[in-house]
């Protein structure tokens, strides 16, 4: 599911935008590339300390979009590339993935699990 170029972007710091929508209103929260942990073939785990509006929206509508990128990775023609991810999400408060992430990021209160259905390079 995830290309070598995508994995290269994750190795470079950059901002990740997480877009949710409920009640006809979009909400955007942010995190960092370095916080994304890939598990299984199409799942990404993200530590969550706040993300209250994100969680409320996901409880109503689990569809999410994420964008991320790095100016340090070669794109189609020039330096800098980005990706658009689409999928569904849920928050984990227990289980093996939660424990693994809590050990790695002690500040988290929950883990955002994104099941990616599409990963498209945009630059």
Predicted regions mapped to residue ranges:
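Binding-site signature for planar aromatic cofactors or substrates
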Residues: 1-123
């Amino acid at each position: 599911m995830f290309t070598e170029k995508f994995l290269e972007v994750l190795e470079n710091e950059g901002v990740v935008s997480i877009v949710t929508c409920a009640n006809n209103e979009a909400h955007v929260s942010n995190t960092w590339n370095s916080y994304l942990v890939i598990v299984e073939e199409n799942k990404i785990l993200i530590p969550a300390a706040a993300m209250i509006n994100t969680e409320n929206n996901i409880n109503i509508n689990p569809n999410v979009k994420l964008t991320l990128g790095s100016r340090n990775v070669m794109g189609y023609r020039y330096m800098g590339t980005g990706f658009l991810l689409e999928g569904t999400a849920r928050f984990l408060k227990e289980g093996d993935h939660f424990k693994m992430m809590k050990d790695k990021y002690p500040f988290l209160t929950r883990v955002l699990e994104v099941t990616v259905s599409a990963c498209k390079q945009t630059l």
